[in-house]
């Protein structure tokens, strides 16, 4: 897969995590909205639950419970990106994270294995290997019209 094949905006279809111990989960549930966009200038990803309640006050004065609920129903990150090459599982895409809701990713590289099938973009990644939370994340995206 070439960089040109990936360029553009893709809408989220599904996000599932499969744990090494056999569990599966949907981090933000199964009713999602959002997109990932790849351009010549960088990439941006945002995913959120479709039923996010509004905060009971302004973003600065909302209760801690409201802030936790908002954080737990939304995910985003942005930065540069490149196609690193091919692996036995697909094309390796490196996301050079400059900004993230999850600050631990900032300044790092998030690698995704990409495949294109039936007009859909499949991105997969491994997380927390060697821990009880070791898992594979699988995201499916449809090109935006």
Where are the model-predicted features located?
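Lipid interaction determinants
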Residues: 1-145
